[in-house]
């Protein structure tokens, strides 16, 4: 199977997000890379579903709470940027202050 670097990146994000989701469901607080992957994967999937950039920017702030991540993580993650594939092309989605 031949994958482009972008496809490999998306698979890595998905794998990390799957691990993060499992840990979150077990009540384990997420660390920095897990939180980034969890939010990024949700944005990528939302784009594939046809949601707009504005919708995803808002949606990204509802995915994790302070109680679901390790101490200090909300302050470390001031924004998440991910290039997502939409029906009309690739766009950069930025989620500001995603963890409340």
Curated annotation (Swiss-Prot):
InterPro entries: Urease_gamma, Urease_gamma/gamma-beta_su, Urease_gamma_sf, Urease_subunit
Top-rank EC class of the record's enzyme: hydrolase
GO terms, biological process: urea catabolic process
Keywords: Cytoplasm, Hydrolase
One family name in Pfam for this protein: Urease_gamma
GO molecular function, one term: urease activity
A GO term from the CC aspect: cytoplasm
Record's subcellular location: Cytoplasm
Pathway per the UniProt entry: Nitrogen metabolism; urea degradation; CO(2) and NH(3) from urea (urease route): step 1/1
Catalytic activity from the UniProt record: urea + 2 H2O + H(+) = hydrogencarbonate + 2 NH4(+)
EC number, as in UniProt: 3.5.1.5
Family the UniProt entry places it in: Belongs to the urease gamma subunit family.
Matches recorded under HAMAP family: Urease_gamma
Assembly description: Heterotrimer of UreA (gamma), UreB (beta) and UreC (alpha) subunits. Three heterotrimers associate to form the active enzyme.
Name this protein carries in UniProt: Urease subunit gamma
Protein's organism: Microcystis aeruginosa (strain NIES-843 / IAM M-2473)
Gene: ureA
């Amino acid at each position: 199977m031949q994958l482009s670097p972008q496809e490999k990146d998306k698979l890595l994000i998905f794998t990390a997000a799957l691990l993060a989701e499992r840990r979150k469901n077990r009540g384990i607080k997420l660390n920095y890379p897990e939180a980034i992957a969890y939010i990024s994967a949700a944005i990528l999937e939302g784009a594939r579903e046809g949601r707009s950039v504005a919708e995803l920017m808002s949606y990204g702030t509802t995915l994790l709470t302070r109680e679901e991540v390790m101490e200090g993580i909300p302050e470390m993650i001031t924004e998440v940027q991910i290039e997502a594939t939409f029906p009309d092309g690739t766009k950069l989605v930025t989620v500001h202050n995603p963890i409340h």
